[in-house]
Amino acid sequence: MEMASAFTLNVRLDNIAIITIDVPDEKMNTLKAEFASQVRAIIKQLRENKELRGVVFISAKPDNFIAGADINMIGNCKTAQEAEALARQGQQLMAEIHALPIPVIAAIHGACLGGGLELALACHGRVCTDDPKTVLGLPEVQLGLLPGSGGTQRLPRLIGVSTALEMILTGKQLRAKQALKLGLVDDVVPHSILLEAAVELAKKDRPSSRPLPVRERILAGPLGRALLFKMVGKKTEHKTQGNYPATERILEVVETGLAQGTSSGYDAEARAFGELAMTPQSQALRSIFFASTDVKKDPGSDAPPAPLNSVGILGGGLMGAGIAYVTACKAGLPVRIKDINPQGINHALKYSWDQLEGKVRRRHLKASERDKQLALISGTTDYRGFAHRDLIIEAVFENLELKQQMVAEVEQNCAAHTIFASNTSSLPIGDIAAHAARPEQVIGLHFFSPVEKMPLVEIIPHAGTSAQTIATTVKLAKKQGKTPIVVRDKAGFYVNRILAPYINEAIRMLTEGERVEHIDAALVKFGFPVGPIQLLDEVGIDTGTKIIPVLEAAYGERFSAPANVVSSILNDDRKGRKNGRGFYLYGQKGRKSKKQVDPAIYPLIGAQGQGRLSAPQVAERCVMLMLNEAVRCVDEQVIRSVRDGDIGAVFGIGFPPFLGGPFRYIDSLGAGEVVAIMQRLATQYGSRFTPCERLVEMGARGESFWKTTATDLQ
């Protein structure tokens, strides 16, 4: 049976050809290799019809133009040559579209990303809708790749090299008005008239490219270009620490095209695409993409979720305020905040106002839309307005008796079906539910700070939590724009449990004489966004270390912090950034204030600050403990799969994405090699480095956690 075409051609009475993009049985349009023959057949018809005045590409999907190329195509390539051939095929197809003798216009609504934007760039003009769903970008770098169908060559010539480099190197997505301002699109119109606006543009002569700004014209010249690439290269190297080869190749390919012409540029682009597709970094980043997509489809349990019409929040502090914001502004649900102090409510409301007002100032949101979203948030000092809330999120202090009291109050003041979700980071959910009348409706919902930025949430059912409660909580997390993983109700859950030994080891190295900045720089070089000491300062030393005694009580002395160090720091009123002094000293509030290591920290903890370890040795000690604990979490079924473990570490604590997560990283090293490293460290530094039984067994058998493909587990 012949496959239904993703591209269909209709010619209007006014001799404008409409090519409709609609990949059968898929929510999103993605480009696949087999579509090339369909497009070529249409191009042949267009060339044969001498009456045609113009062509319009438009999507039949409600919220996307083309979301990119199908990433599975890259995974199917076994060699760099195969991936290079894939890129050349894409380049050739785009060249054939561009070579049509009549105006070709892309009518864009929704996501126009990757190969989708490359197709739009091959057209002679572009019109997009003013809808918030409309975004344009080249995100290939986030998969360890570069645009392979001409994007590195066409974009700099259209909008200027410095602007194009920013887009390609970061994967930054532009909204409609930004795209218009930069000259990426020719017009922005309401969705209702998108097709007609594109048709009118197609009836005119080919749109002439607008002159580039003076700055971009200077940077396109030999001297300006040399200066630009030197500056951008330095900045990129500092940001990536040399861990992402795609950024270096992007700079090389764009510069080749500008210096030697498009023919050389296309050749360099295809070659680089093929080579990058085979790098371990790209394979790891693609595995994270597939795993996160998979997690987002996971309902959490087999039971159907209950309806979610409104949410309540207990506590208007920083976490409560952030949760209220994502519930109202991302999930679109009415949310009511209860705080015993009216100031807490005001703080929470102001938090959402500040977030939304920032979007209005950046022209990402209309003022009317801001007001509409703010209207979803209300506050109270008692339980008025809570009677029919479907789910209550508790975000009060980490105190077991207080949280148990909250459960009792919710059961007394809310409906029989109301779910109680605790945002605890350390207390067992089973203990919180111990005196509940409806324990099956009590669950953990652990957000990470800052709530609006951190993508992960841990969902923690206790032994008595119902399947429907799990499914409903997962459903809410997804509506809030989060990536949820379901974890077992054991001390520290997953993320904090693997993070604690990593931070403990950093503190231990401080006491041995390593300097704060050396430890942090070593882990940033390894690939973490910030070092462990800075992370502790950012989270708050008091908050971040509160879980250590809980973990030590549950799992023994491998979780013990160096004696008296934490208490010495806290007794000196050092809480980190929030009170201006921790391991670092912070200037006055404001973006320009720089932190610096406080030299007084060394005598305070009885250290000299004259270490002897190299950066790789520092990173090895911290990371190996994290890997060992992650394997224990699989063994104890704290996480349901290594997929969840990799996603939890990357999205929850910034484990280097280019390594694919703890389990991908163990596989890349080999379990046997990890065991050997840990045994060496155990001999040098003590029994906390003893590899767990599961790792030793896997090393002996030569086993791995993942199969060779990006999506399958062993």
Curated annotation (Swiss-Prot):
Pfam families: 3HCDH, 3HCDH_N, ECH_1. GO terms for molecular function: 3-hydroxybutyryl-CoA epimerase activity; enoyl-CoA hydratase activity; long-chain-3-hydroxyacyl-CoA dehydrogenase activity; NAD+ binding. Pathway: Lipid metabolism; fatty acid beta-oxidation. Residues 306-714 are annotated as: 3-hydroxyacyl-CoA dehydrogenase. It catalyses: a (3S)-3-hydroxyacyl-CoA = a (2E)-enoyl-CoA + H2O; a 4-saturated-(3S)-3-hydroxyacyl-CoA = a (3E)-enoyl-CoA + H2O; a (3S)-3-hydroxyacyl-CoA + NAD(+) = a 3-oxoacyl-CoA + NADH + H(+); (3S)-3-hydroxybutanoyl-CoA = (3R)-3-hydroxybutanoyl-CoA. Residues 1-190 are annotated as: Enoyl-CoA hydratase. GO terms for biological process: fatty acid beta-oxidation. The gene is fadJ. GO terms for cellular component: cytoplasm. It comes from the Bacteria. Its EC number is 4.2.1.17, 5.1.2.3, 1.1.1.35. In the N-terminal section; belongs to the enoyl-CoA hydratase/isomerase family. In the central section; belongs to the 3-hydroxyacyl-CoA dehydrogenase family. The record marks 118, 140 as: Important for catalytic activity. It is found in: Cytoplasm. Keywords: Cytoplasm, Fatty acid metabolism, Isomerase, Lipid degradation, Lipid metabolism, Lyase, Multifunctional enzyme, NAD, Oxidoreductase. PANTHER family: TRIFUNCTIONAL ENZYME SUBUNIT ALPHA (PTHR43612), TRIFUNCTIONAL ENZYME SUBUNIT ALPHA, MITOCHONDRIAL (PTHR43612:SF3). Heterotetramer of two alpha chains (FadJ) and two beta chains (FadI). It comes from Escherichia coli O9:H4 (strain HS). The lineage of its organism: Bacteria, Pseudomonadati, Pseudomonadota, Gammaproteobacteria, Enterobacterales. Its main location: cytoplasm. This is Fatty acid oxidation complex subunit alpha. InterPro entries: 3-OHacyl-CoA_DH_CS, 3-OHacyl-CoA_DH_NAD-bd, 3HC_DH_C, 6-PGluconate_DH-like_C_sf, ClpP/crotonase-like_dom_sf, Enoyl-CoA_hydra/iso, FA_oxidation_alpha_subunit, FadJ. Catalyzes the formation of a hydroxyacyl-CoA by addition of water on enoyl-CoA. Also exhibits 3-hydroxyacyl-CoA epimerase and 3-hydroxyacyl-CoA dehydrogenase activities.
